[in-house]
Amino acid sequence: MVTAHGAVRVKRAYYYCGRCHQSFLPYDDAVGLVDEISPGLRPLVCLAGTLAPFADAAEDVLKRFSGVRLSASTVLRTTEGEGERLRAQLKDGRMVEPAQAEPFWTKPRDDGQPAAYVGLDAFSVPMQGLRAGKAEHRMLYAALLYTPDKEHTRYLVDFELNTLAEQVRAQAGAVGIEQVSQLIAVTDGGNGLEEALQRQLAANLTTVLDWYHAAEHLCAFAKVWLGADEPACVAWQHEAKGVLYERGGDALLAHLRGLDLPPGTSAEVREEYRKLVGYFEHNRHRTDYPTYRANGWDIGSGPTEAGCKIIGERLKGSGMRWVEDGAATVAALRALYVSGGPVWDGFWSQPHRLAA
């Protein structure tokens, strides 16, 4: 057995049942030994595999951490195995309990402030095709549950949007937030994000459209309509964003419908105008920015975008290509790690259950 202090020879009882043809190793079950890596070393191996590419983790990071020498394939196998165990646990609705109490999730908030914000977005993962060839990127969804002061965050990931939204609900309950009315979701206009959260949490979940995402749509239209380098383009962007920020989505829609596009306006501009109006009509219920700001609510999804980058950087290194299961398991451990030391430690202190 390989431990943090080097290789150790372990003698333990081995039993075999001639009737059921099953072997039994009681010592292994008692200490959580699943292969040659000791239970004490496994968290360190997985931490290295979560922080760095497997070869770097084995040849540099792990060796510097502990002096232990393992092959890259061993680090890969151990990291993905524990990541799969974590994924199985989360899909079963069993959230990881932190190693120490976290009362900040349920402490009283200022008037109008939510117990937590919910963020949901996706980022692309480079995939490997047949015979080690390139394949299309796949979108991996990342969800966040974070306190209003941004000091505490839980991260979750999955390739399946509905599965991830279910885990958000379970995670909110696990930290003591029982009422959906205590949550506010801030997302961009990505297809299906708001709907998935409303299906799995509640249809009346309060949702806010990311202000910067909405403003980008106004800027994009202005560039097509007036020309990116024209003073009129900058002036109209400033005016339209001011209407949205100070008066909200209903006022902006009235402003947009009042635009006088001359008869010679190109088909491209008219189509972009149609899409812009449709976008704000679809999202008008979550663009009341004056009220949100008066309540002291967040109107930007910066924490979620940052979370996608923090998790995604482990999957997007130079030359990296992933199979789906490998990406999902490593991303799950990465999300657990960046959720904070108490949660990471809590996972390793659990009784070891093999993934089904």
Where are these regions (language model features)?
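Catalytic center-proximal scaffold of phosphoryl-transfer enzymes
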Residues: 13-356
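N-terminal juxtadomain amphipathic helix
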Residues: 1-13
